[in-house]
Amino acid sequence: MTRLPLSRRRFMATSAGAALIAGASGLASPLRAAEPIKTAGIYTVPVEQQWVSRIHKAALTAQERGDVEYVYSENVSNTDYARVMREYAEQGYKLIIGEVFAVEQEAREVAADYPDIAFLMGSSFKQDEALANFAVFDNYIQDASYLSGIIAGAMTKSANIGMVGGFPIPEVNRLMHAFMAGAREMNPEIKFQVSFIGSWFDPPKAKETAFAMIEGGADMLYAERFGVSDAAKEKGVLAIGNVIDTQADYPETVVASAIWHFEPTLDAAIAAVNAGTFTAADYGVYSFMKEGGSSLAPLGTFEGKVPEAAMALVAEREAAIKAGTFSVEINDEEPKSS
C-alpha cells in the first residue's frame, strides 16, 4: 500500500470511567485525568475499511469527550509500520493504537524502546508480561456472529452459504466458526463454501469470489470483506454483514450484521493510562457481548421477515450470553468448506 503523510486531526475529550487492572504496576508518571492523552492511530488500510473504521470511530468518540488528542496515519505499508510507530513515539504521543498482525515482532521491538509509552495493538498473539507497555486486543465478536448465523440458517433456502474472508487468521476464523455454529442450529445439514482472498481490502476480488459461490449454489453470503454484499445485491441473494452495519447501503440484501464496538476496549485503555496502571494485558475481553463490545444490528428492512422460531432462539441465546449462562465456542482454527 502507498504510505500517506501523517494526518494530524486533533480532537478533545473527557475522562473514561474506572481504571483497568486497578493496582497493577503500570507506566510511570500517570497523566492528569483532565489532560487529553496524545493518541495516535496507525492503520495499514483506509479508515473506511470496516475493521479499522470501528477503532477510528471509538477514537473520534473519545476525542469528542476530551479524553484524547487524536491523530492517525492510514494506508501504512507493513514495511513502514515500525518507522511510523517510532515517529509518533518521538513526537511525544502517550498512547499508540493500531493493528500489527503482519508486523508482530517489529512492533514489539519498537515498544521495547519506549517503555513510557502505552501501545494497544490488534494482534493474533497474547500479551508478554516482559513487555509491560504493550497490550493486545482483537475483535472477539463471536457472540454476535453466532446470533447472525442463526438468522442466516433460517433464511437460506438452498441450505448453501458462501463465506468470503480476508486471511485465515484467528480473528477471522473464530467469527466464521461462530457464524457456522449458529446457522447449524437451524439446519445441521447446511453446506458452507469458504474462501479467503489474501487481502484486507480488495472489494473487486471479494466480489468475484462471491460470484463463484453464488454460481455454486449459495443463496446466502457471509460478508467478512467489502465487495461480498455487492455481489449478493447484483445476483439477488442475501448477505450477513460483519463488524459494521451496511444495511442502509443494501436494504434488500443485508439481513443482519454482527457489530463490533471498540469503545469499551479503548475506554479501558484510556482509563488505565490516566491511572498509571496501563500494563501488558489482553483487552480482547472488552469485545465480548456481555462487556458491550459487540451486538446484533437491528433487522431494519428485514423486520418481520425472519422466521419467528429463529428470532425466538436469537432472543433466548442473546439473554443467556449476556447473563453468562451460554458461551459461544472460540475456535481459531481455519474453517473449511463442507
PLM feature spans:
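Hinge/cleft segment of the Venus flytrap/periplasmic-binding protein
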Residues: 275-338
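Extracytoplasmic "Venus flytrap"
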Residues: 38-65, 71-80, 101, 168-174
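C-terminal segment of N-terminal export signals and the immediately downstream linker at the start
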Residues: 27-42
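Short beta-strand elements at the ligand-binding edges of bilobed clamshell
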Residues: 128-151, 163-168, 251-264
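Flexible loop/hinge segments that line or gate small-molecule binding clefts
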Residues: 112-138, 243-253
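Periplasmic-binding protein-like
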Residues: 93-100, 120-122, 216-226, 242
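An alpha-beta-alpha
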Residues: 59, 145-187, 194, 282-304
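N-terminal secretory signal peptides and thylakoid transit peptides that target proteins
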Residues: 2-22, 29
